[in-house]
C-alpha cells in the first residue's frame, strides 16, 4: 500500500513548495520592473552627476567606479558559477543534510574568494580593509579596551582631533572590537581581517537554510541553499565587515529557530552582539519576532512556549547590552551621535529624492534578480493571509519590512549593497516559491549579476 504525505488546507503536500503553473508571466513582469528600476537608477544617477549633484558614487546606484577588468579570480568564479548552476539544484534536493551544508559552505567560500580575487590579491583582498576609512586604521591606537569603550561616544562626531574614522564612527564599538580581538590573538593586518570577513560571511549559506529547516520547511531550505551560495552580495562579503554582521545576525536567528529552549539564550547573545555591530540591525528585531512567532509549539503550551523563548533571548540581548553599558557605552547615546555624524559628511549632499528609490536598485544587485519575483510570490499569500506559518513567506516579508524602514529613515543613502547584506540574504528564503524547473535559470541570473558587477565596476573603496 502506497502512502502519501499529508496535504495542507491549500491542497498541496506538506513540506513542498506550492505549484507555480501559469505564473511565469508574472515573474517575467517583475523581472522587467527590476530591469527598469536599475536602468532608471543608472541613467538618473549619471544625469545628476553631469549636473553637478553630489551623489558621491561614481557608478550610482552602487558605491563604485566604472573600470572594466579581469583578474586571477575570473576563471575560478566562472567555474564555481557553472558548477553550482549545473549541479546545485539537484544536489540540494538529494544530498544528506550535513553534507549539503558542508558542501554549500565550501562552495560559498570558493565563490566569495574568487570574486574578491578578480580585483587582485592586494587590492581585492589583502589591502581592502587597510584604508583610512576602515576599522583596521584604528586598531593600533586601541591599547586599553576599557578606556576605548568608556570614551567611544566622545570621538564619534567629526572635526575633532581624535575623531574616529568613517566606519568606526558609524558603528557601535563591537565592530572595532572584533578586529582588535583578531589583532590581540596574533591575526592582525589586512589579510587576516579580510579572511575573517569571508570565512564568517559564507556561513549565511548554512544559517539561513538551517533556520528554514528548524521552522519546518526543509524543502524551502534546500531550494534556497544554492541561491545563497551564488549570492551576488558576495562581491561585498569579500571583503567587508558587513559580511561578519550578516553572519552574526543569521546565526542568531538560526539558533532562535531551533526547537526547544536551550538555544534561546545563546541566540539572544548573538543578537545582542549584532545590535552592537551595526545600529541598523535594530531593525532585525522584526526578523527575530517573526522567527519566534513561526516556531513550532506544543499544542498544550501554545504561545506560552514562545513567550519563554522570547524572554530567554531577550535576556541574552540584555546581557550583552548591559556589558557594554557597564564598560561605558550606551547604544542610544551612540545612535544619536551617529545620526549627527552622518549629516556631517556626504549624507548632507546626497539627495534623498534619488537615493530613496535608487537604493532599491542597489539592493537588487546585492540580492540578485531572483529576489524580486520570489518576494512577489511571497507577498501574495502574506496579503491574502493564506500563507499559514510558512517561513519562506514570512521571513522574506519581514526582511523587506526592515529594508523599507531603513530606506525611509534617510540614514542609508547609498552603499546599501553592503549595508543591507544582513537583510538581503533573508529575501532569498522566498526562492522556494519559484518554479523548481526554473531554478537553474534564476541561478544563472544570480551568478551573471555578480560577475558583471565585479568585472565592470571597481567596488574597492
Where would I find each of the regions flagged by the language model?
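Start-transfer (signal-anchor) and selected internal transmembrane alpha helices
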Residues: 1-38, 54-131, 312-313
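Hydrophobic alpha-helical membrane-interfacial segments at the cytosolic entry of transmembrane helices
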Residues: 33-37, 101-108, 266-271, 301-330, ...
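Hydrophobic, aromatic-rich transmembrane alpha-helices
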Residues: 82-87, 364-393, 400-407, 429-430
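Specific aromatic-rich, kink-prone transmembrane helix
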Residues: 207, 245-263, 426-430
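Membrane-interface alpha helices of multi-pass inner-membrane proteins
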Residues: 229-233, 251-253, 263-290, 319
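Short acidic/glycine- and proline-prone juxtamembrane loop motifs at membrane-interface regions
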Residues: 233-245
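Perimembrane helix-loop-helix junctions
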Residues: 253-265, 282-315, 384-385
Amino acid at each position: 500500500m502506497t502512502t502519501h504525505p499529508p496535504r495542507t488546507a491549500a491542497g498541496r503536500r506538506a513540506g513542498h513548495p506550492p505549484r507555480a503553473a501559469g505564473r511565469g508571466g508574472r515573474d517575467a513582469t517583475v523581472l522587467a520592473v527590476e530591469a527598469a528600476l536599475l536602468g532608471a537608477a543608472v541613467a538618473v544617477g549619471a544625469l545628476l552627476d553631469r549636473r553637478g549633484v553630489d551623489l558621491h558614487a561614481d557608478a550610482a546606484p552602487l558605491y563604485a567606479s566604472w573600470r572594466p577588468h579581469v583578474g586571477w579570480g575570473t576563471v575560478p568564479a566562472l567555474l564555481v558559477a557553472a558548477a553550482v548552476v549545473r549541479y546545485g539544484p539537484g544536489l540540494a534536493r538529494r544530498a544528506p543534510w550535513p553534507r549539503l551544508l558542508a558542501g554549500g559552505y565550501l562552495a560559498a567560500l570558493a565563490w566569495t574568494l574568487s570574486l574578491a580575487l578578480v580585483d587582485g590579491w592586494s587590492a581585492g583582498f589583502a589591502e581592502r580593509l587597510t584604508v583610512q576609512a576602515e576599522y583596521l586604521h584604528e586598531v593600533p591606537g586601541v591599547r586599553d579596551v576599557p578606556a576605548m569603550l568608556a570614551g567611544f561616544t566622545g570621538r564619534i562626531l567629526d572635526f575633532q582631533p581624535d575623531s574616529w574614522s568613517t566606519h568606526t564612527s558609524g558603528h557601535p564599538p563591537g565592530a572595532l572590537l572584533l578586529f582588535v580581538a583578531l589583532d590581540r590573538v596574533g591575526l592582525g593586518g589586512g589579510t587576516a581581517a579580510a579572511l575573517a570577513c569571508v570565512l564568517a560571511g559564507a556561513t549565511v549559506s548554512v544559517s539561513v537554510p538551517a533556520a528554514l529547516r528548524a521552522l519546518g520547511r526543509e524543502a524551502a531550505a534546500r531550494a534556497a541553499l544554492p541561491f545563497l551560495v551564488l549570492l551576488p552580495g558576495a562581491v561585498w562579503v569579500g571583503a567587508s565587515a558587513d559580511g561578519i554582521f550578516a553572519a552574526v545576525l543569521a546565526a542568531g536567528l538560526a539558533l532562535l529557530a531551533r526547537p526547544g529552549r536551550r538555544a534561546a539564550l545563546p541566540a539572544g547573545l548573538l543578537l545582542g552582539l549584532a545590535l552592537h555591530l551595526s545600529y541598523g540591525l535594530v531593525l532585525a528585531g522584526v526578523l527575530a519576532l517573526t522567527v519566534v512567532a513561526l516556531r513550532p509549539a506544543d499544542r498544550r503550551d501554545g504561545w506560552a512556549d514562545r513567550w519563554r523563548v522570547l524572554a530567554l533571548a531577550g535576556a541574552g540581548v540584555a546581557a550583552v547590552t548591559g556589558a557594554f553599558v557597564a564598560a561605558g557605552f550606551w547604544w542610544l547615546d551612540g545612535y544619536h551621535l551617529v545620526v549627527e555624524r552622518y549629516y556631517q559628511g556626504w549624507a548632507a549632499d546626497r539627495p534623498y529624492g534619488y537615493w530613496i528609490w535608487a537604493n532599491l536598485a542597489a539592493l537588487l544587485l546585492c540580492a540578485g534578480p531572483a529576489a524580486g519575483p520570489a518576494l512577489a510570490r511571497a507577498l501574495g499569500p502574506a496579503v491574502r493571509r493564506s500563507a499559514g506559518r510558512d517561513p519562506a513567506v514570512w521571513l522574506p516579508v519581514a526582511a523587506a519590512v526592515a529594508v523599507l524602514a531603513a530606506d525611509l529613515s534617510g540614514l542609508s543613502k547609498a552603499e546599501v549593497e553592503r549595508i543591507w547584506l544582513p537583510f538581503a540574504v533573508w529575501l532569498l528564503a522566498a526562492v522556494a516559491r519559484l518554479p523548481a524547473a526554473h531554478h537553474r535559470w534564476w541561478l544563472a541570473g544570480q551568478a551573471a549579476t555578480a560577475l558583471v558587477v565585479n568585472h565592470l565596476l571597481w567596488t574597492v573603496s
